[in-house]
Amino acid sequence: ELFFDYAQETGAKVAVYRFPNLMGHSRPKYNSAVSTFCWAVANDEPFTVNDRSTELELLYIDDLVEGMFDLLENKEKHCEFDGVETVLKEDGRYCFVPLTHKVTLGEIVDLLQKFKQQPITLMMPKMPDGSFAKKLYSLYLTYLPTDKFKYTLKMNVDNRGSFTELVHTEDC
């Protein structure tokens, strides 16, 4: 309320955000379950998920930065809140970044396990642009030790030549 009062009294522009859980590279085993899971899976460390059905609303750090650029260009999104739910409202007092992802802990861990198995199965989950999977994969790679970036590929050779499969997708 102090900021809103200040804006009212001075005419200054004030932008108040209430962010959901942020997701980006951070110290594992500190304050981010997602970073901890990424680090643990990438480094073969044990971890515990108490309830796979627990849902998180996550905002990826790159999307947060994009939202801040929108604010600087006067393109921010406004809202009000109904409890913790964001209600889009053009003349709302609050601002928000609309690119969030609601996912369960189980979905996060399952995706991370698929990423970990990719060098063995060559199977890559669907990762459309802007998807949670693509953002999680980008984060996972930041925790992957450099020696795990390379792996042996099988070359198929016959009288026609050679062929090496690098990756499979679920659709092909």
Which residues make up each language-model segment?
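Phosphate/oxyanion-binding loops and surfaces in catalytic or ligand/nucleic-acid-binding neighborhoods
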Residues: 40-47, 70-78, 111-119, 166-169
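Mid/C-terminal beta-alpha module of Rossmann-like enzyme folds, strongest
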Residues: 74-155
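A conserved pocket-lining segment of Rossmann-fold NAD(P)-dependent short-chain dehydrogenase/reductase
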Residues: 16-21, 39-59, 79, 88-98
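Substrate-positioning beta->alpha
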Residues: 28-36, 53-74, 106-110
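Active-site Tyr-X1-5-Lys
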Residues: 1-16, 32-43
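Conserved catalytic-site region of short-chain dehydrogenase/reductase
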Residues: 22-26
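A short glycine-rich, His/Asp/Glu-containing loop-to-beta-strand
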Residues: 146-172
